[in-house]
């Protein structure tokens, strides 16, 4: 709490990775305590662990009660290129982004431009079009 004056009214803690959603039980408990102390909370995630299957989804819903903001890393909107970059398709990440929009949880979308890997004009246009469908993206 000694750093709270430094944070101001909007500052707080950000949990990043690895992938914080792989430690969801810990993050829930940490964020519960943070909220008790009046600390803003943020998760920096690639979203890959997201699923609406149990037991993950009920834990994720609980975590969202204590989360003020998510930084969602969309590495590539094109599923095939996303799989080439990461080894996984992006369907669960897209599903997570849509769910966060449904519950109106504030999100910052992040995308790293890597020449010849994630900077294709058609994919950037598609990413922009997708972001336009979300009601919760904080610009």
Residue ranges of model-derived segments:
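Conserved AdoMet/S-adenosylmethionine-binding subsite of the radical SAM
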Residues: 2-12, 17, 21-139
